[in-house]
């Protein structure tokens, strides 16, 4: 039976000017991931990257640690949703990151404050009631990721394994598909 490993990128640079890059911790995580996969003698017949910088950096560290020199194929179907647009649609003032930062700092616990805002923004996006406010609706995002998995599965031979470097949202969409869950 073929296998698809969905690998979430290492820690991104939350709070920096460019979120779409790994932090120092994220780079270390990518190497540890590769070492773990190598130790388990994980097969890697097909390598896929979602196309974001954090995906590529995770793949580079992981594959180097595994002793693999091949470059992953880029597949935009495994890209993450646009979390910045999702937050801006929820509250247009969040287009200015300083406004978002000020909002979450008011909570006293910035991580929990951000999580609360993010959950509300994600619920709004997933509701389907405001699809015109987004470049990609939740349903379109799920359809895109499902297409990526379906196409990838069709390419794999009977005992082949694919490593897919992606993000948590895409992985969640695959879980949603496999479990037959509703949009909410």
Describe the predicted segments one by one.
Residues 2-77, 135-140:
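Active-site-proximal alpha-helix that buttresses catalytic centers in soluble enzyme cores
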Residues 11-13, 53-54, 79-81, 168-171, ...:
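Short, solvent-exposed loop/turn segments at secondary-structure junctions
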């Amino acid at each position: 039976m073929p296998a698809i490993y969905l690998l979430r990128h290492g820690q991104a640079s939350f709070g920096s000017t460019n979120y779409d890059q790994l932090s120092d911790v994220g780079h270390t995580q990518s190497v540890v991931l590769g070492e773990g996969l190598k130790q388990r003698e994980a097969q890697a017949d097909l390598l896929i990257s979602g196309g974001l910088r954090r995906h590529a950096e995770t793949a580079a560290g992981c594959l180097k640690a595994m002793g693999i020199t091949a470059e992953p194929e880029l597949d935009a179907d495994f890209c993450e949703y646009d979390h910045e647009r999702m937050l801006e649609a929820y509250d247009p003032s969040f287009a200015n990151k300083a406004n978002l930062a000020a909002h979450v700092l008011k909570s006293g616990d910035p991580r929990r404050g951000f999580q609360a805002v993010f959950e509300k923004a994600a619920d709004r996006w997933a509701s389907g009631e405001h699809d015109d406010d987004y470049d990609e609706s939740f349903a379109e995002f799920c359809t895109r990721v499902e297409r990526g998995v379906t196409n990838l599965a069709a390419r794999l031979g009977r005992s082949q394994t694919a490593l897919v470097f992606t993000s948590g949202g895409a992985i969640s969409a695959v879980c949603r598909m496999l479990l037959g869950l509703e949009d909410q």
